């Protein structure tokens, strides 16, 4: 059986990206027909991509977006304004390309997969891009008992790793998102556990909570985290105590991307919490992550500060699903095309000064 030691042994194998290739990319960028560093984030993207894949850069043509869907027992405490049935309904709408992430991925030519890691309800129709990995029908109510067992948490993490291991032969890069009721509550509890920052700076309204619901959400998180003393736990123990199957699987997806040396785009608040936990297990994982857009959820600022990261899209979005991450894909494509195609001043002079 895959235990925690097996997971940590695997994670410890993750290496940092190649600094020699980063320097080669920097040299090439500096000789282009532009002022030094004038393309800002696009140059950063080129260097990160070079570090992961080597230089010269190849086009990242085959892109895969993975939405992880699960439900959370903490909904019993009134911390979400959405009914739990919403998870499977919206997930099926994604698969039919009529929910936002389905529309975006179709428009951008990105392959979409939805993973049922723990939805309460089943999607009864068959879809080729629906991955059935249900551990059980939602987590426990973490206010009353721990969200899941350590073994269930490990199963969710290894599921994420295995999905990337399987798909890495067919795809150049990945992005991920989530779908699940009350997962801003689980994410906020995890962020509170890692950083112990002021709860008012961490917890947002999620799907649209009232003032009363927001205060209840904060109270539930504080009391549960203090009861379990999550502040002294590692990422796996935290997830088992106050997390969700979706967050555990996303952590595994980040680990899998780093193990397979693939770029993976980080979306908003919930995706960023999973990324924070992954990086707490091996800092090298951060080398393979590209943080894309700044969510409207307040806790994302704490994560970005904690990891010393910046996003390059700010669109007042807080939908989830990975919608912000996939919108970054054309920017990445342009960055790679730029470094591969743009000429130096001397080359342009020789071409046209005739």
UniProtKB/Swiss-Prot annotation:
Active site: 321
InterPro entries per the UniProt record, alphabetical: Nict_dMeBzImd_PRibTrfase, Nict_dMeBzImd_PRibTrfase_bact, Nict_dMeBzImd_PRibTrfase_N, Nict_dMeBzImd_PRibTrfase_sf
UniProt keyword annotation of Ribonucleoprotein present: no
Enzyme class: transferase
Alphabetically ordered keywords of this record: Cobalamin biosynthesis, Glycosyltransferase, Transferase
CDD domains (alphabetical): DMB-PRT_CobT
Function: Catalyzes the synthesis of alpha-ribazole-5'-phosphate from nicotinate mononucleotide (NAMN) and 5,6-dimethylbenzimidazole (DMB).
NCBIfam families linked: cobT_DBIPRT (TIGR03160), PRK00105.1 (NF000996)
Stated name of the protein: Nicotinate-nucleotide--dimethylbenzimidazole phosphoribosyltransferase
Organism field: Fusobacterium nucleatum subsp. nucleatum (strain ATCC 25586 / DSM 15643 / BCRC 10681 / CIP 101130 / JCM 8532 / KCTC 2640 / LMG 13131 / VPI 4355)
């Amino acid at each position: 059986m895959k235990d925690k030691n097996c997971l940590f042994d695997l994670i410890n194998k993750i290496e940092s990206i190649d600094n020699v290739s980063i320097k080669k990319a920097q040299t090439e960028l500096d000789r282009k027909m532009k002022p030094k560093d004038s393309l800002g984030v696009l140059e950063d993207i080129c260097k990160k991509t070079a570090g992961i894949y080597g230089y010269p850069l190849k086009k990242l043509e085959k892109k895969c977006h993975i939405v992880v869907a699960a439900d959370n027992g903490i909904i019993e405490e009134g911390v979400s304004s959405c009914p739990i049935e919403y998870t499977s309904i919206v997930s099926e709408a994604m698969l039919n390309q009529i929910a936002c992430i389905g529309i975006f991925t179709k428009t951008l030519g990105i392959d979409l997969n939805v993973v049922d890691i723990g939805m309460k309800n089943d999607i009864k129709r068959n879809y080729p891009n629906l991955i059935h990995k249900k551990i059980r029908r939602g987590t426990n109510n973490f206010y009353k008992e721990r969200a899941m067992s350590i073994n269930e948490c490990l199963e969710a993490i290894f599921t994420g790793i295995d999905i990337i291991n399987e798909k890495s032969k067919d795809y150049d890069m990945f992005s991920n998102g989530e779908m699940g009721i009350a997962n801003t509550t689980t994410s906020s509890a995890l962020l509170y556990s890692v950083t112990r920052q002021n709860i008012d700076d961490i917890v947002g309204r999620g799907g649209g909570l009232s003032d009363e619901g927001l205060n209840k959400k904060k109270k539930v998180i504080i009391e549960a985290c203090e009861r379990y003393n999550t502040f002294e736990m590692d990422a796996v123990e935290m997830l088992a105590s106050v997390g969700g199957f979706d967050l555990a699987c996303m952590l595994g997806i980040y680990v899998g991307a780093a193990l397979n040396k693939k770029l993976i785009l980080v979306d908003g608040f919930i995706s960023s919490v999973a990324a924070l936990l992954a990086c707490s297990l091996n800092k090298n994982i951060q080398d393979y992550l590209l943080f894309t857009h700044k969510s409207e959820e307040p806790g994302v600022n704490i994560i970005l500060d904690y990891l010393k990261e910046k996003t390059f899209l700010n669109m007042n979005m807080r939908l989830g699903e990975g919608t912000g991450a996939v919108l970054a894909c054309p920017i990445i494509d342009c960055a790679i095309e730029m470094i591969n195609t743009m000429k130096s001043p001397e080359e342009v002079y020789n071409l046209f000064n005739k």
